[in-house]
Amino acid sequence: MKRQVFGLIFIVWARFFGLFVILPVLSAYASGEAWQIGLAVGAYALSQIIFAAPFGHLSDKIGRKKALALGIAIYGLGSVLCAIFSDSIYLLILGRFIQGAGAVGAVASAFIADIVPENSRSKYMALLGLGVGMAFVLAMISSPIIASYLGLSALFWLCALLCVISAVILLGLAEPEKHEHNETTTTYELIKNKNVRILSLSNFFQKMFLNAFFVSIGLVLVGQMGFERASLWQIYALCAVFGFFSMGVAGFLGDAKGKAKELFFASVIIFALSLLVFLISPSFENILFAFVGAVLFFIAFSLGEPILQSQMSKLTKAKRGVALGVLNACGYGGSFVGSLLGASYFAPYVM
């Protein structure tokens, strides 16, 4: 079981690394107007809105492994397209949309939940959260460095390489056994469930703030304050230290100590504070304001992210793929809206 879980954690890690590694630099390196760059960031999310829940449903029907393989292949195709045409904003948008069509995040989470016993799930969900946290930290530090030396296309080639590695690992994993559950809940009833809606709406706003932040920070620091693009990694590295620590706290207290609700409320409050500080930073043209806002943002995101997936996976067994698909679809809906909002709000400061 452990080999299965760690293989899946790597696949999830690679998926999130591929997502995070693009965010810090796309707004600084992509050529185009602010709204086009926002759309390039958000196209991935728009596609996920459409395909996340159907992929989750598909995995409930044909099995997690087959659904994962299909999603990895689609994501790899989109990555190659982005790598080849990274200088064309419209083809970049198309490639990002194809990347998002390989919506396997929920499938991988459901796969892990299927093979881990109920009494051990909190421990492995904490490890999954730690894997996401490590992807987040590594992406924030490495992305600006790689882009400054090799260009934006190199990051997409890296995403394609991670797809190949993930596919090889997937070949060695066994399909989880199907268990007959006594649940009679329909998909429609599941979506109407109060807890499902609360978690999904929370994920929408969390990812909206995430993408708005990453579109904004590139436009503000580079476009307005004259910060060197090659030095962006320094900002992200410092922020990631705080975020990584917060992710560990969330993984331990959220599942192991049953403090998920308290941690999530704390993340919401810190989110609001970080946005307030960051939104006023262009008016003061003070990089310290932007940095403090970024640190608070990383802490808030890292506290909230591990909790959402873990809590949703506990709500249902028979339709776990659908539930996590709905959660991810709402999250990527927020990502798409946040990308456009961030570009729209900060565009006047970089014109």
Placement of each model-derived feature along the sequence:
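Cytoplasmic helix-loop-helix junction between adjacent transmembrane helices
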Residues: 95-131
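Central cavity-lining transmembrane alpha-helices of secondary-active solute carriers
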Residues: 42-55, 237-249
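Helix-to-loop junctions at the C-terminal end of transmembrane segments
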Residues: 52-63, 246-259, 346
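C-terminal transmembrane helical hairpin of 12-TM major facilitator-type secondary transporters
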Residues: 261-308
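Cytoplasmic membrane-interface "Motif A"-like loop-to-helix N-cap segments
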Residues: 61-71, 256-268
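Short amphipathic helix-loop junctions that connect adjacent transmembrane helices
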Residues: 24-35, 215-231
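Juxtamembrane intracellular "pre-TM" segments in multi-pass secondary transporters
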Residues: 175-202
